Amino acid sequence: QHTVALHQVQWPERTRQAQRTAHFSDGGSVQCTDAAAWDAWARQSGLREPLVVCLQQSWRGVLASAVLLVAALLALQQWGLPLAARTVAHALPTHVDEALGQATLRAVDEQLMKPEPSAIPPAEQERIRTAFRQALGKLPAGEVPPWELVFRASRIGPNALALPGGTIVMTDEMVQLVDSNTDVLTAVLAHEMGHLQHRHGMRMLVQVMLLGTVSSVLLGDFSTVLAGGAALVGQSHYSRQAEREADAAAVRILRAGGISPAAMVTLFDRLAEKRRASKAPGQPDEKNGKDGKDGNDEKAHWLGLTFASHPADAERVRFFQEAAKGR
């Protein structure tokens, strides 16, 4: 006869129908095919199963766990991860942003820009920089991070991109779209400065990495499919939030510089005119590419003003119209 204390026995996780097993420290084990009798003996002996095992034996427990898991993911996405990413991003030294920005600029030049240099004359480029610098000069000291404005001939049409580390890329087509209107171009740059002020590039990277990691941990074996989808959904949500923050920053900069926020409304009007002009005659918006945008816009969805996850144009237009009225 072999006697072993219950606390020295290893009890594998049970299932509803399979045989019951116990493992001993000396390598031996016992099996019982009468699951009901084994379970009755276990209850009488005071053996308690972990809560997870109990939940797995009940469809109600599984359903409740799934609901709690989804709620936890949503709460993390809405509040936890943005706060964590903001904290992590601001704790990182700025040279990390600069290194990331340089790598991103190389990718942008290779994938989105034309090989030839900008066609905007140097004097015109400097005029745009000077106007923007004057608007920023009215802000309180310390609110403006280091920045550099560069111009590129692009394959993506009118656009402007704020890269980590302080580089702002403006395409020639953006300047041409608004006929070199200084107020409108300053408004565009003010929006991009909002991204730099909030370090959105670094925050987006940290948030997506955190969301993917947390999703993989929580979703377990389903992480390959579901965690990737959760990360994409989260990234889109975070991008919309970033755009709203950048729009609010643009309004502050424009007001400080004595420029009406209605300048951004002019930009959206010009973009809408360009989209209408690029459509085939009689073709409705929703049939022309994605959301009625032209092929150039399709290439730029991952960066800049035509980002696919930007808030709807109508929402943003209303925001700047209200801001222009002083609200």
Where are these regions (language model features)?
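N-terminal intrinsically disordered, acidic low-complexity segments at the extreme N-terminus
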Residues: 13-50
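Phosphoinositide-dependent membrane-docking surfaces
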Residues: 3-14
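Short acidic-glycine loop/turn motifs at beta-strand connectors
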Residues: 1, 25-26, 164-165
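A Zn2+-metalloprotease active-site environment signal
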Residues: 44-287, 296-326
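Well-ordered beta-strand positions
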Residues: 10, 23, 161-162
